[in-house]
Regions:
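Conserved N-terminal beta-strand and adjoining loop/helix that marks the start
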Residues: 1-19
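Short, acidic/hydrophobic/Gly-rich beta-strand patch recurrent on exposed beta strands
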Residues: 21-24
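Short, solvent-exposed aromatic-acidic interface loops
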Residues: 26-29, 102
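A short gly/proline-enriched turn/hairpin at secondary-structure junctions
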Residues: 32-35
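Unchanged
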Residues: 38-64, 68-127
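Generic C-terminal helix-cap and adjacent flexible tail
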Residues: 130-135
């Protein structure tokens, strides 16, 4: 069984309430969060920061106090762990990476929950919203 690992984050901003950044991936057309494979000697947080910058152009403040892991099998004989952190956007000027991202959207929490394609991502978003409410 081959193991893969990706890291990313739930990127948010506070603008008349909290808004969540969702990206529509070119590969599959699903709505999710910025993430990508860990490269060589990167830490989880370095990977998350790099992927957010690549996919959205945003500089963010990473909050590693929030850390959720999702495990799934993207194809036979492969198990993938995805680590998600929280990341507060420093600016609103997100721009999609044309090679990987079809569209970017800032959405209020309830709309984001409805738009996210996969149940596991919805569960991570719910955990993030609970975390944010306690912070």
């Amino acid at each position: 069984m081959k193991k893969e690992k990706s890291c990313g984050a739930i990127v948010y901003r506070e603008k008349d309430g909290v808004e969540i950044l969702l990206i529509k991936h070119k590969n599959g057309g699903h709505w999710a969060f910025p993430k990508g494979h860990v490269e060589k000697k990167e830490t989880e947080s370095e990977t998350a920061l790099r992927e957010i910058k690549e996919e959205t152009g945003l500089k963010v403040e990473l909050d590693t106090g929030f850390r959720e892991m999702v495990t799934y099998s993207p194809k036979p004989n492969v198990m993938k762990d995805v680590i998600y952190f929280a990341a507060k956007a420093k600016k609103d000027s997100a721009r999609p990476q044309p090679e990987e991202v079809l569209e970017l959207r800032w959405e209020p929490p309830q709309e984001a929950l409805a738009l996210v394609t996969y149940t596991t991502d919805r569960e991570v978003l719910q955990a993030f919203l609970r975390y944010l409410a306690q912070s």
